[in-house]
Amino acid sequence: PSFYFAVSTLFYIFASNTNHDNLFGKMIYVSLPTTQTRRLSFYLAMEEFVARNINTADDCFFMWQVEPSVIFGRNQLIENEVNIDYCRQNNIKTYRRKSGGGCVYADMNNIMFSYITQSENVSLTFDRYINMVAEMLRSLHIPAEATGRNDIMIHGRKVSGNAFYHIPHHSIVHGTMLYDTNMQNMVATLTPSDEKLVSKGVKSIRQHIALLKDYISLSLEEFKQYTKDNLCSSEITLTDADILAIEEIEREYLTQEFIMGSNPRYTKVNKMRIEGVGELEARLEIKGGVIKSVNILGDYFLVGDINADIIAPLIGKPYDLQHISLSLPDHTELTIRNLNKYQLTELLYGKQENLSV
């Protein structure tokens, strides 16, 4: 039988908070039985395992670090986001996650945060989480603010980018915390569009990011301990059997089909950048004036079922403004975060004068 739904035997260890008062809540910290560094995909699978198998009303949290890796969003096309040749030449691994959002570089000087909650409202959960992390940073006298779609900023520069997705009965939020990083690798591996950089008011990736080490005297390990002590009030340690179950889940993340994603044929491409939504690219296959396939790429965030809500109703319909408008739901923002029906219609069909949907 699959380990996917394995029932865990867990050891509860109450975290020591003798040096710090717990500031922000009573999350459970989830630890591994050993401290070895694992593949990035393992930690993504660990999030799923925790969500599906740890039976607690409390939220769960853990931190992790990886060897140089690139991780891109569920709806992104790898060749649009990553310098694949540089990654291969420098042994930088590439992974796809199940959440939306953009592409990030991670290494051992960059801390990754994972947060798992029973909350069903992913948008509300997301906002609450990034504000909690920003508040924790401010407790260290770091002028951090939760801004934009998914970022935590210091003086207008990003120190943390986050993404989220939903599985039955749980929401998962994960993100970066830039303590330090190999700037050469970050700049060389990521290939954001000129439009994305301009929208941030910068000319390069380096201009857009902040590093925690420039704002605090704590070492990386000291910062991790401070975070754990102040966000969590208890701790569990997974078992060896749990590790086997996580590795079973991880297999999906390692398949070429999952990493490369689907890239169906297309005859028409429309691109837009929408404030509060992200960069979007619609690829449609139109034959005889009829929509045969639709693929919406980008760093947007899904909060609903895009296939059932948006794509399936379009397939087989004539490619014209009226049929697109009639096929789309009235509240597309319930599927793609912050994207209204007018904007989605424009993405699919192109900008029209006096467009009414």
Report the location of each language-model feature:
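Short beta-strand elements
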Residues: A163-F164, M177, L280-Y300
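Active-site loop/lid in soluble adenylation, ligation, and acyl-transfer enzymes
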Residues: F24-I78, F164, I209-E279, R283, ...
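Short, surface-exposed recognition loops or helix-turn segments adjacent to catalytic cores
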Residues: I142-H155, L238-A245
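Short, positively charged and aromatic/hydrophobic N-terminal segments
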Residues: Y4, F11-I13, N22
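Long, positively charged amphipathic alpha-helical accessory segments at protein N-termini or as interdomain linkers
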Residues: V133, S160, P168-S262, A308-V357
